[in-house]
Each structure stands twice: as structure tokens, then as C-alpha cells.
Design a protein with these regions (language model features):
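Aromatic-Pro/Gly-enriched surface loop or interdomain linker
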Residues: 1-53
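An acidic, glycine-rich "communication" segment
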Residues: 2, 95-195
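Structural recognition of the beta-strand scaffold that forms the well-ordered cores
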Residues: 6-8, 32-33, 53-58, 91-94, ...
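Solvent-exposed loop/turn segments at secondary-structure junctions
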Residues: 12-13, 38-39, 60-63, 98-102, ...
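Short glycine-/acidic-enriched loop or helix-start segments at secondary-structure transitions
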Residues: 16-18, 65-67, 103-105, 187, ...
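Short, flexible loop segments at the rims of nucleotide/cofactor-binding pockets, characterized by
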Residues: 30-36, 68-72, 205
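Short alpha-beta junction capping motif
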Residues: 48-105
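Extracellular ligand-binding/catalytic regions of CAZymes and related secreted enzymes
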Residues: 195-259
């Protein structure tokens, strides 16, 4: 029986054709792809309850305009659909910029174990500066756990991708993969708030605590299997065979497969 995969995207630009090739390479799955906001949260809420596998590649809940960003929470129906799915033990995979989505949904970020902040804000009741980003970082992805998501992967493999410097609570998850060969310190990243205001690749007036180098993990706070993969900014990552294997493993695992 062909299993169904629901992919949610939108809210952050990406190259559609290479991403489509990534989805095609994952397996013989019946793929439904809904895009915020055109896909509609109501449509997504209905599909979320039915899909065998769920991939969040969206960054919803933001409006960027004129050098500012505003946020809004997901609809009650959308939240209820995801909460009900997890309550039934049906899992999901969140990828790359999904870590930033739904800034006004604390439960979502509690399940994920962290958040990417486009503006200075709060995480776990503490004030935090806006988060950092760095494109096209060449690093070694090192496997740190024997887990269905990492099955069949070499102990270490090269990745060139965007990395984040942001609040991450390692007590909320089981680490699976870490990025080695690159320091997660403010002087290696750029300010997200500066980028929003029009100053890309700037860290002027910005500082940030050193951060976690964990780039793949399984949540320990979500009632269903929830895996986050920070890999996934662009075509080089989409085409990386080890990233493809890890994503396919994660989708299989979170849908109740054996990995």
C-alpha cells in the first residue's frame, strides 16, 4: 500500500524544482504539497489528520514588509489538527526554517526544543536577542546516536548548508547529529533582525550567547515522534545523498516505520 506524505511549505523562499526532486527521491509515496498561505490552514488542518507522514518545511505566521516583521498565531483548527495528530501518536518531521515558524505558538516550540527569533524576544521565560544565521557553511555532520533516523549513514559526512545560532534546549530532545568544524559563536553568524531591517550579513550592534551545535534530534517533549533536521536550505543540501537518507529515515520513523 502506498503511504501518503503531506508536505507543508511557504513563508520562506526556496528553489521549487530542486526541492521537488528531493521529494521525488525520498520514496514511492503519495505526496500532497500545500503552501502557506495559498494552501490555506483549513485545507492543511484536514490533511494533517489523514497523512501517514508529515513534513514541515514552512515558516508560517510572519508578515515581512517595509523592513519590519509582524507575527500571528496559527488558526485554532490548524493547532487542533496537529495537537490531535500528536495525541494519537502520529509523528512528523520539521526541517530547516520550520524551526522559526509560528513564533506565537509556544507549544510548538516546546515540542521542537527551541526557536529561531527574527526579533529579540523570549524563550522559556528568559529574554533572548534575535537569532543568528550563516549561509553556505561547510561542516562535518557527525552521528552521535544509534537511532532509526541515522541508520545507514556514515559516522561523519560533509554538508554545506545554512546554520542557526538560536535558543536550543538540549534537555528537551535526544541529539542525533552534530555539526563539527564550525564554532557556534556570535562572530560566526549574522543578525536576523538586521536582515529584516534591510542589512543582510550584518552583526552590527548584535551579540548572542554561544549556541548548540546539534543539527538533528528527536523531541522528548512531544507525545508522538517528532524529528527536527536543520539541514535543508537549498539545492546542494537537497541533493546530498546522506541528507536524503536521513530525511527518508526520519519520515519513515515518525510514521511508525522501523527505519
Amino acid at each position: 500500500v502506498t503511504r501518503s506524505l503531506l508536505v507543508l511549505s511557504g513563508g520562506h523562499p526556496y528553489e521549487e524544482a530542486p526541492f521537488g526532486q528531493l521529494l521525488d527521491a525520498l520514496g514511492d509515496w503519495d505526496v500532497t504539497h500545500l503552501i502557506h498561505p495559498e494552501g490555506g490552514e483549513a485545507d492543511a488542518a484536514d490533511a494533517i489528520g489523514r497523512a501517514d507522514m508529515l513534513l514541515f518545511y514552512d515558516m508560517a505566521g510572519y508578515t515581512f514588509a517595509n523592513g519590519t516583521v509582524t507575527t500571528h498565531p496559527p488558526s485554532l483548527a490548524f493547532r487542533a489538527a496537529i495537537t490531535a495528530r500528536f495525541a494519537r501518536g502520529m509523528g512528523a518531521v520539521a526541517m530547516h526554517h520550520a524551526f522559526a515558524g509560528w513564533a506565537e505558538w509556544p507549544e510548538w516550540h516546546g515540542w521542537l526544543g527551541g526557536a529561531f527569533l527574527y526579533q529579540p524576544g523570549e524563550w522559556q521565560g528568559e529574554p533572548w536577542p534575535d537569532s543568528g544565521y550563516r549561509h553556505d557553511v561547510a561542516y562535518d555532520a557527525r552521528i552521535v546516536a544509534d537511532h532509526p533516523v541515522t541508520r545507514g549513514l556514515p559516522e561523519s559526512f560533509p554538508v554545506t548548508d545554512e546554520l542557526y545560532l538560536c535558543p536550543i534546549d538540549e534537555s528537551a530532545f535526544t541529539p542525533l547529529v552534530r555539526a563539527e568544524g564550525f564554532a557556534f559563536t556570535a562572530n560566526n553568524f549574522y543578525s536576523a533582525a538586521n536582515a529584516v531591517s534591510g542589512a543582510m550579513f550584518s552583526r552590527e550592534g548584535w551579540n548572542h550567547p554561544s549556541g548548540s551545535n546539534c543539527i538533528a534530534w528527536e523531541s522528548r517533549t512531544c507525545p508522538a515522534p517528532l524529528v527536527y533536521l536543520q539541514c535543508g536550505d537549498g539545492p546542494a543540501t537537497y541533493a546530498n545523498p546522506h541528507v536524503r537518507r536521513m530525511l527518508a529515515n526520519a519520515l519513515d520513523y515518525t510514521s511508525g516505520g522501523t527505519g
